[in-house]
Design a protein with these regions (language model features):
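Catalytic core and acceptor-binding pocket of nucleotide-sugar-dependent glycosyltransferases
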Residues: 104-110, 114-208
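Short, well-formed alpha-helical segments that are part of the catalytic scaffolds
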Residues: 14-29
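Short beta-strand-to-loop acidic/aromatic patch adjacent to the donor-nucleotide binding site
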Residues: 92-103
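Active-site-proximal specificity loops/subdomain of glycosyltransferases
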Residues: 39-90
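A short acidic (Asp/Glu
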Residues: 18-21, 47-50, 71, 105-111, ...
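Short loop->beta transition adjacent to catalytic acidic/histidine clusters or analogous donor-positioning motifs
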Residues: 3-5, 28-38, 57
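Short acidic, S/G/P-rich loop/turn micro-motifs used as interaction or catalytic elements
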Residues: 12-17, 43-44, 102-105, 157-159
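N-proximal low-complexity "stem/linker" segments adjacent to membrane-targeting elements
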Residues: 1-18
Length: 208
């Protein structure tokens, strides 16, 4: 494919079976010309990260936010946002956001994602393209709770989604109720990310 694509992998490095490293090795072998960005934490030494640099992985060593947020949402925001910003800074047009504990085995997944964006056009002046997300962890009755595990799209749309303020609320102060609707309206975690994004593109959030 001719488009400039970056893969942003965010989160703590999974050292068991060298999972994160081996995943990036697979991506590097499969896609020698794309950018691989590992957005992780500054708790790892430069020596620990040298093997990633040896396979031409761009490393971002982030400082963890003072407050992790509910279910570590602020950690995810920080590492993802900074990784996507680096891809944007380097001039990449498209970006895949994935996690350090996940691996995609399909050999042509980048081309598949690009084809989906080309086939399914979007008419929204506030977005360049659609955003592709995984069905895994996307639930029918959790309104606006799209999965945050994997996302692919135009770099501008991706940055718009993840360039969000930290959620400073603590769980004990959040009224979540007992129904799926009440939980959704609490706007925590995935719902927080999605609803904040929808506000930016002037979408009416109705919880219906």
């Amino acid at each position: 494919f001719k488009e400039k694509v970056a893969i942003v992998m965010q989160g703590p490095i999974v050292t068991k079976d060298s999972f994160t490293y081996e995943t990036l090795k697979i991506y590097r072998k499969r896609f020698p010309k794309i950018s691989l960005i590992l957005s992780t934490w500054n708790e790892y030494s430069k020596d620990e990260l040298n093997k990633f640099k040896a396979i031409n992985v761009e490393i971002i060593r982030n400082t963890k936010p003072d407050y992790s947020g509910i279910s570590n949402i602020n950690f995810q925001i920080e590492s993802t946002k900074n990784g996507i910003f680096k891809a944007k800074e380097l001039g990449f047009k498209y970006c895949l956001k994935t996690r350090t504990d996940q691996r995609i085995y399909r050999h042509d997944f980048i081309l598949f994602f690009l084809s989906l964006l080309d086939i399914f056009k979007i008419e929204n002046k506030n977005l360049r393209k659609r955003l592709i997300i995984a069905s895994l962890n996307t639930y029918k009755y959790r309104l606006y709770g799209v999965s945050d595990m994997l996302m692919f799209g135009h770099i501008d749309d991706m940055f718009k989604y993840w360039n969000v303020s930290f959620d400073k609320r603590v769980l004990k102060d959040v009224e979540m109720g007992v129904s799926a609707l009440e939980y959704s309206k609490a706007c925590i975690c995935e719902v927080y990310l999605c609803t904040e994004f929808l506000k930016k593109i002037n979408y009416c959030i109705s919880f219906t």
